[in-house]
């Protein structure tokens, strides 16, 4: 997808969220984190779990399908609406987690809930405990412990791109899929999980968006 199209979509989602849910103070960089991991598709496709999906990884619900049967058009405006609603729902759920203490972790919790669902996220017990310690004291050591716990999961082996982008956000404070040499620089002598090392030391071309994303 071209940069201009990407910016237009992110801008539209940001505007909708900031207009309808200004109290959440969801930034464009948070929306970009979701977008950079998920990509965007203007057409319906079937995801790896068999769900009909469109836009920013929006899985069609029974209600969505009923509305489509009644004539709902899958134009850009509708896809932006779904994306905004999905992001807001996940961020709201992120803030209800007992391990949530500061907004520094909100995009990470939010995206994981967006991707895994509330129940799926609840299974990441050790990661959530490590995230709590990281929020209480944002040191490199605590950051590594948190990322190692996230890396120690089947999810991390399936979506190394997501692990890489989240790691960049935690360690750099920026949303990017770039090469992450800081992991080795910061944590020499530390035990880096193989999944985390694999995700952060791959060349960027390895992490191209799936072909169905346009």
Question: Residue spans of the language-model regions?
Answer:
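Long, amphipathic alpha-helical surface segments
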Residues: 1-21, 29, 37-40, 74, ...
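Short, mixed-charge amphipathic alpha-helical segments
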Residues: 16-27, 95-104
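Residues that flank catalytic or metal-binding motifs in active/ligand-binding sites
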Residues: 30, 48-50, 105
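Short, functionally critical alpha-helical segments immediately adjacent to catalytic or ligand/cofactor-binding
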Residues: 30-39, 108-113
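Surface-exposed patches in mature extracellular/periplasmic domains of secreted proteins
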Residues: 42-45, 94-106, 145-146
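Substrate-binding/active-site groove segments that recognize
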Residues: 46-71
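Aromatic-anchored, charged helix-turn/loop surface patch used as a conserved interaction hotspot
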Residues: 62, 68-100
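Charged, low-complexity intrinsically disordered segments
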Residues: 99-126
């Amino acid at each position: 997808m071209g940069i201009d199209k990407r910016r237009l979509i992110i801008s539209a989602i940001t505007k909708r969220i900031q207009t309808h849910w200004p109290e959440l103070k969801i930034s464009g960089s948070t929306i970009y984190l979701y977008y950079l991991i998920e990509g965007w598709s203007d057409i319906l496709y079937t995801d790896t779990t068999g769900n009909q999906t469109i836009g920013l990884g929006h899985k069609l619900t029974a209600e969505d399908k009923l509305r489509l049967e009644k004539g709902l058009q899958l134009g850009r405006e509708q896809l932006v609406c779904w994306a905004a609603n999905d992001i807001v729902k996940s961020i709201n759920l992120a803030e209800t987690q007992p391990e949530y203490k500061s907004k520094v972790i909100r995009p990470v919790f939010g995206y994981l809930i967006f991707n895994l669902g509330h129940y799926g996220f609840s299974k990441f017990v050790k990661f959530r405990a490590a995230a709590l310690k990281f929020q209480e004291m944002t040191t490199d050591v605590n950051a590594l412990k948190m990322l190692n716990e996230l890396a120690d999961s089947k999810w991390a082996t399936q979506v190394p791109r997501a692990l890489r982008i989240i790691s960049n956000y935690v360690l750099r404070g920026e949303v990017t899929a770039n090469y992450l040499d800081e992991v080795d620089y910061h944590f020499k002598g530390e035990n880096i999980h193989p999944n985390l090392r694999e995700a952060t030391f791959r060349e960027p071309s390895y992490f191209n968006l799936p072909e169905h994303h346009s």
